[in-house]
Amino acid sequence: MNKETRIQKIGEILARPDGSHGGIEIPWEDALKLMPVYKIPLTLLVYNKYNGRILSRTKSLEQQNHQISAETEVGRDLIEKLLWDSDPGRNKQTQNSIKKIGQEKVGIITRDGIIIDGNRRAMLLRRSGNDYFKTVVLDVTLEQNPNEIEKLETTYQMGEDEKLSYNPIEKYLKAKFLSQRGVPIDDIAKWMGETKSKIEELIAVMGTMDDYLDYLGCNGIYTQLDGREDQFITLTKQINNFKGEQSKKPFDGYKDNDVDDLRLISYDYIRVKYEGKDFRNIAYGKRENHFFGDKKIWQSFRDFHFEHVQPIKDGEEKIDFATENLTAYLNDRDNRFFEKSKNEKGKSFFTENIESHYQLIQYRKSHNEPEKLINNAIDALDAIDQGHKAFSAPMVMEKIEKINEITIKMLRRSAPERLLSHVVQMLKSIKCEDGREEKDEMLLKIKEIERVAYQMEKDIKAL
């Protein structure tokens, strides 16, 4: 049914002497106005495809070049499915209530039948076999007064009672959408029932979300933001605080390109849905509590991440935007990305990197508790299986030599006599028969030890 026919038929209902069924006050043009309520056939109504409850879904579909015409049967059925899937549990409860007592809350439509408030209710009434929708009818079309209708729609959709039932991402999209249309921040705040600073935060976080989708190569596919709101809030605060190289929370001398690395690494962790304390360990809170607060720890964490994540990304296939169910396809792609990050024991390098560097943070906090740290080191060394083939790997041997250098340095600094005792024990522990193949090299080392010992003896006697 076209627009002109809907206007005509709705107008005929409004013109009947007995057409109205009571009235309600609604905010219209900066005043509460008492408006009559009518029973309008559901066949004359058109869903609002940009309804705040499903905005992320319709925008995602349109990004895939899906044309959603709410006036067609196909478009209507698609929007009804999106409305139902937005909250099946709550929809079932409301549907049961409709079957028992009918429609409780009155809707709002334009004179040409576009639903401004009540899309979900209209869908449930249709599914319940009802024929009519109780509603106020505005005396304008959407095109005749778009700003006032947007204001009314936002006030109803994002009111305190309604916003709790919406997908969390929808409020960010709504704030962005209104801002892009030129609505002042103060007005958006009033319409959405929020403070000005909250709206500014919503728009900033939405900017991070858009950048994340661009990073993944799926711009505008807002369904990929589901379940990730808290991480985006945290990351946006971090980036805003750190940019400009003036913050005291990162390590001394950090640069904006370090902040860029932080953002990219955080995007990878957001993709695999790391959250809570694990995610905040990367760069949230006081300097001493996160990786980005210590240059050495951060660089180690960063290098490990990029070294391990890049081969996985290089092996990913290009996104097939023509796939029938893009959301399921992208979710599966993200799951496979995470699965490829796991080793033969099933542990992801994402987890390994967080855990190992979190341990370094704890070590740093215990810098004035040497006994505690040394006991931890002993326990870690005792846990090594020296019979495992990996133990003799060159990289492992280099690390052992590094440990030896550190312990010698510690003993030399505070207990030279203990160091000499340690050297004697080490010399006594050497099994000469094990060095047949390196006989000449060992003899040279022994000569060098003799020279060093002779010089030490002279120096000590001279004290």
For each feature predicted by the language model, list its residue ranges.
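C-terminal amphipathic alpha-helical interaction region
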Residues: A383-L463
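Tandem CBS (Cystathionine beta-synthase) repeat/Bateman regulatory domains
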Residues: P27, R53-R57, Y166, K174-S179, ...
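Long, charge-rich C-terminal accessory regions
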Residues: L225-K409
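Short, charged/polar connector segments at secondary-structure boundaries
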Residues: M1-K134
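Active-site-proximal acidic segments at structured loop/helix or strand boundaries
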Residues: D210-I233
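Amphipathic alpha-helical repeat elements characteristic of tetratricopeptide repeat
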Residues: P88, S165-I169, E371, E417, ...
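Amphipathic, charge-rich alpha-helical segments that serve as recognition/docking helices
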Residues: I79-W84, N130-D214
